[in-house]
Amino acid sequence: MTTSPSATGTTAPGATAPGATAPADGLGGPLPHTLLTAIAPATWGTFYVVTTELLPPGHPLFAGLLRALPAGLIALAIGRTLPRGSAWWGRAAVLGVLNIGLTFPFLAVAAERLPGGVAATLAAAQPLVVALLATAVLRERLSAWRLAWGVAGMLGVGLVVIGPAASFDPVGIAAGLGSAASMALGVTLTRRWGRPPGVGPTAFAGWQLTAGGLFLLPVTFLAEGTPPPIDGPALVGYVWLGLVGGLLAFVLWFRGLTSLPVTSVAVLVLLSPLVAAVLGAVVLGQTLGPTQLVGFGLALAAIVAGQLPAPRRGGGRGGGG
């Protein structure tokens, strides 16, 4: 296993993140990168069906741990590259805790104390938080276009997943917003710092998954105690979450974050509750009524609009997407 070259500078606002230029992988343009990155939140949308149908109840942190730590160790073995220098060891730890170590427990608390639809809608606030953070951390101009479609996307997700009997537990709401804020800050810092030169997306994801998994290890056993027995269906579920929802998804996600505009990537998280709703209809026999279909269309429109530059104003200056 080798160590990565050191990187002393940070990614300049508006510049391509270190080690992530589009021509290097031969994909040729932003659309293939966007489609590959979208696989990540789409696979995260399977988490709800896998959890309810395959995993033992009452152990969401254990599921998060198995989603992160084994995937991180596998990615490290494949990438065979460790951080070099105290700066990147520290950055890998910070990003791992923000993107995974804090996000997963917050999600678990929100899912436990709120109806799934409310929790999903709070998570859909992430594009708005990223748009605000990008102005402070990346020095990007705050775009009314991004904000408007971020609100539209959150509203669309709410129409899809929130039922008339939804309850609003304050602790659950705080946890849901904490999850969105934690991952939004992690996403923004990932874009700010980029990847060190010579480090591929698999190794980069491995650093963060391992750091987040190690953070989750004591938290899980303190909060949930002894792990549950794992039968055949649970084994299938944990393997899916680890290899697909963990390893594959986060490699593609972090790859996209260092090769695409951060606000464009952030809005892709809206795919997660939409995929969950589709699987609920197909696998669990749930129905999507007219209001939900309208919300579905609104959220999809927000995802597409989030990949486009803001319309030019009448005089000719760009909107600054």
Feature map (PLM): residue ranges:
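Glycine-/small-residue-enriched transmembrane alpha-helix faces in small-molecule transporters
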Residues: 1-65, 109, 155, 165-192, ...
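Specific transmembrane alpha-helical segments of multi-pass solute transporters/efflux pumps
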Residues: 42-51, 76-123, 131-133, 159, ...
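C-terminal-most transmembrane helix of multi-pass membrane proteins
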Residues: 2-5, 19-30, 66-69, 162-163, ...
